């Protein structure tokens, strides 16, 4: 079996790599995993990958197997995705291509649109055009929010909807654009494809090993990080007002669950689109209360935001002008849930309750919200 993976140094991609290698080992598969990665400064792509495979958060089964033997499964293609070429076409013939690289950026700023579109859509198109003549199947890792603002029950098919989509930001738009491109081109080429869509990724929850670990803190973690450091810096906590739909929730799914679903699904021809999501979104008001309690910021309130809303203090201004304006479209969105019947039949969705959400935030706080950059 041959698999090509992009994004192996990322928060999700690294776990996909872990799971593929574990499958190779435990099932005695004669496999080759091609990793498209690039150097970072003076650190080569090989050194970056080796660092991930010999770290404190590497699964024990891989550490026990040993780095030297693990690298026997790997071939690292040291290049930037924007500069990829087909010079190694014979090696990768009939491989599964899992495109997990991308820029997660929920910015609503106009000056970020082109960058977000390039990193997610243009590079996806370039990669697809380069590799599609040689591969067996193209698996695109998108986002469960790529169909924009939704209400009610959300099914797995995002490409036969009878209404116009309303995207909250350039990221959602770029991801949906990429999905449409992949589906259209694969149909033309008669190339099998799969669109897999995680929701908001949280820390590990399968098993006890490195529980709640995640290498990059995004989305709800960023709110927790902001108020954690604000609480440490300020003796007097200024009141911050939040506009939240109290009926709505944030769909959070553990990173290791997402990776396992991808690795257990990419060979299935009966699945074209799949949302990798929780069966129950975590209530936004309860989530905010847990975050603020855990990071020690007590002075906040929930309001109905009006058109003449103006900042009442410095902290409120800093919050809204940094991450708040990007998170608000999710905090005020209509209530919805996802149909997880098919997903749960592949692997049972781990329960996310108040205790486990608290532990996610606590893990991040104890580790000072420090991302792991390799």
What feature does the model see in each segment?
Residues 3-26:
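N-terminal Rossmann NAD(P)H-binding glycine-rich loop of SDR-like oxidoreductase domains
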Residues 28-31, 37, 337-374:
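Amphipathic terminal alpha-helices
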Residues 32-71:
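Glycine-rich phosphate-binding loop and adjoining beta1-alpha1-beta2 segment
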Residues 62-94:
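Conserved Rossmann-fold cofactor-binding substructure of NAD(P)-dependent oxidoreductases
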Residues 96-99, 108-113, 118, 122-173, ...:
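Conserved Rossmann-fold NAD(P)-dependent oxidoreductase catalytic core, especially the SDR/UDP-sugar
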Residues 185-249, 255-257:
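NAD(P)-dependent short-chain dehydrogenase/reductase
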Residues 229-242, 307-349:
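A hydrophobic C-terminal alpha-helical subdomain
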Residues 261-326, 368, 372-373:
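Mid/C-terminal beta-alpha module of Rossmann-like enzyme folds, strongest
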